[in-house]
Design a protein with these regions (language model features):
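Short pre-active-site segment immediately N-terminal to the catalytic Zn-binding motif
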Residues: 163-182
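Long, amphipathic alpha-helical stalk/connector segments used for oligomerization, subunit docking
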Residues: 219-293
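Contiguous, non-catalytic segments that form substrate-binding/exosite surfaces or channel walls
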Residues: 34, 38-167, 350, 354-358
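An active-site-proximal "capping" alpha-helix that borders the catalytic cofactor pocket
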Residues: 185, 208-223, 286
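Inter-helical turn/loop segments and adjacent helix faces that build the functional surface
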Residues: 57-60, 125-128, 192-201, 221-235, ...
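Post-HEXXH active-site segment of zinc metalloproteases
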Residues: 179-180, 191-216
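C-terminal, non-catalytic "cap/extension" segments appended to globular domains
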Residues: 52-69, 87-90, 94, 264-363
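Short beta-alpha connecting loops at secondary-structure transitions
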Residues: 167-168, 198-205, 270-275
């Protein structure tokens, strides 16, 4: 599983030439970021100066408009998001969750077996998802040959090239890594099925729901491996590990609203601070909504996929509207924002891990 490096170099040359002509006003930031990231990780930093050339001339205009929009959205959705975040931290606290990385206890699996399982899983979701995933591997657009300690993986996409590139930085030695890969492949599926054909050119600040499809595929792949007893231990360990950032993102959401309640002034927050909070909000919402989708998927696959399709198709029209998402689920609002719908699932997964590793509730 490795990139066709020669083809990628040709792709990056084409992208660089396109951006050099100043044609990136609509493409920023995804194409510039793709060139930057692929150059840094794959081509040793070649052409990396393109970022500095456009960073300030293009981003400033984009940022101000989207900053104002994001700030209004955070204020408008405060009741929803603050309650959702508090509910998640309360649920994990009440079911004796303890962050305990146990990757060293996992049995190594062959890369080919993990990829085969991933393809079988995608086939079980839909033929289209399977074809996209298979094409990514066949065309040398997925690699686990590069290491970056800051990230588990990344999916870079280019509207100009109409391609995605997935890098898995953890290697592919067990099914926990496979879940990270399914997350990044989920971004690629999102790109090919929605972002590209619908012309969803993304602003510098993501909308609230950009991490929903990727985290959804990650969660249902996790359940697929667990339910089929392919490697239950790896999934128990992975759920424990991935729950930790979910809780951290929830804490960030709570912290932000505490800040707002202490006399927050729109003019006082710096762009880089808002960008960092935006990341936390996106991932928290992605995890939260996809968790509800994954629980629904176990009960009604068709309905869950229909809701995912609605979210991905229409997100630029309601990019910051949590209420619209709740309407799609057609469940009680309180049940959604209080976490009642997903609490049994979380408790079961935490209990499975604690039982497996003999973790006492008194710890």
């Amino acid at each position: 599983m490795d990139f066709d490096v020669k083809q990628i170099k040709r792709d990056m040359d084409r992208l660089y030439e396109f951006l050099e002509k100043g044609n990136n006003s609509l493409m920023y930031p995804t194409d510039v970021n793709t060139l930057e990231n692929m150059s840094a990780n794959i081509l040793g930093g070649v052409k990396s100066s393109i970022e500095s050339k456009y960073k300030y001339s293009k981003v400033k205009d984009i940022n101000k408009k989207n900053e104002d929009k994001l700030l209004r959205a955070l204020e408008d959705n405060q009741v929803y998001l603050n309650t959702m975040a508090s509910s998640i931290t309360d649920i994990y606290d009440s079911c004796d969750y303890i962050y305990m990385p146990m990757d060293d206890a996992l049995e190594c699996k062959s890369k080919s077996d993990i990829i085969c399982t991933l393809l079988e899983f995608m086939k079980s979701v839909s033929d289209r998802d399977y074809e996209i995933t298979k094409s990514m591997f066949r065309n040398g657009l997925v690699s686990d040959e590069f290491y970056n300690p800051m990230y588990g993986g990344v999916c870079n996409w280019s509207y100009y090239l109409q391609k995605c590139y997935v890098l898995l930085f953890t290697g592919l030695s067990h099914y926990g890594n496979g879940c990270i890969l399914s997350h990044e492949i989920g971004h690629a599926i999102d790109f090919y099925k929605y972002a590209l054909p619908y012309g969803q050119i993304k602003p510098y600040y993501k909308c609230f729901f950009d991490e929903v499809p990727s985290t959804f595929y990650e969660r249902i792949f996790l359940d697929y491996i667990k339910d089929k007893k392919i490697d239950e231990k790896a999934i128990d360990v992975y759920f424990n590990r991935r729950s930790f950032p979910f809780i951290c993102y929830a804490d960030d959401v709570i912290d932000f609203y505490d800040y707002m309640s202490e006399g927050y002034d729109n003019g006082n927050i710096k762009s880089e601070e808002l960008y960092n909070y935006n990341d936390s909000f996106n991932y928290f919402i992605g995890y939260y909504v996809s968790l509800h989708l994954a629980v629904l998927y176990r009960k009604d696959k068709k309905k869950a996929l229909e809701i995912l399709d609605e979210i991905c198709s229409n997100r630029l029209y309601f990019d910051y509207d949590i209420g619209q998402i709740i309407d799609y689920f057609k469940i009680d609002i309180d049940s959604f924002i209080d976490g009642d719908y997903v609490e049994p699932y979380i408790r079961k997964r935490v209990l499975d891990f604690n039982k497996r590793f003999n973790i006492s509730s008194t710890l």
